[in-house]
């Protein structure tokens, strides 16, 4: 199966999961990225079961609205039973690197409110040690050079994310992203805390302190479920 076929497989599995596990009338948490987009497409078939959705990005909000979902502001919501999102890498503990799509801060906020985080990914995303995928760090623009120096002191090689047109990439929050390569992440929780404490960092794309509760992994043999 191709990577796209595996993504579609886990997206449908996640739609089946929320149909079974999320009570009618509840609010659904929705992530960002190519796999999350396929989940939105799949879950739209029974969108009327839900009171609405909280989205982690402007892009996901647009896609949800195109399908007729009511998109709610997180400040209006007290409870999100399940948040569904992809990952750039995930390890055996359920810790993840996220933020390749630039929505790491809002993803982390919505995930922190959710009762369960369901990660959907193809088999290539499950790794023994994270760090091959560059670690995104969202940074206040005025602090980008200072943060880059401190991240380099931790052993990383930070690079400012750029748009295809050569301009500096900006998040939905108006900040910049440093993509940090060269890290072998053997202590995800410790590194998440260390980077988050650097002044000027909004958040790092390590989801270890609040990792996944369920992994739906697309493989050639079908969808494998892991509970953490």
Curated annotation (Swiss-Prot):
One biological process term in Gene Ontology: pentose-phosphate shunt, non-oxidative branch
Keywords: Isomerase
Molecular function GO labels: ribose-5-phosphate isomerase activity
Catalytic reaction annotation: aldehydo-D-ribose 5-phosphate = D-ribulose 5-phosphate
Enzyme's top EC category: isomerase
EC number, as in UniProt: 5.3.1.6
CDD domains: RPI_A (cd01398)
Pfam families: Rib_5-P_isom_A
Pathway(s) the chain acts in: Carbohydrate degradation; pentose phosphate pathway; D-ribose 5-phosphate from D-ribulose 5-phosphate (non-oxidative stage): step 1/1
Keyword Mitochondrion on entry: no
InterPro entries xref list: NagB/RpiA_transferase-like, Ribose5P_isomerase_typA_subgr, Ribose5P_isomerase_type_A
SUPFAM superfamilies membership: D-ribose-5-phosphate isomerase (RpiA), lid domain (SSF75445), NagB/RpiA/CoA transferase-like (SSF100950)
Binding residue positions for substrate: 32-35, 85-88, 98-101, 125
Residues of the active site: 107 (proton acceptor)
GO annotation, cellular component aspect: cytosol
Keyword Hydrolase attached: no
Family, per entry: Belongs to the ribose 5-phosphate isomerase family.
Subunit structure: Homodimer.
Protein's job: Catalyzes the reversible conversion of ribose-5-phosphate to ribulose 5-phosphate.
PANTHER family for this protein: RIBOSE-5-PHOSPHATE ISOMERASE (PTHR11934:SF0)
NCBIfam families (UniProt xref): PRK00702.1, rpiA
Protein name, UniProt field: Ribose-5-phosphate isomerase A
Provenance organism: Cupriavidus pinatubonensis (strain JMP 134 / LMG 1197)
Gene name for this UniProt entry: rpiA
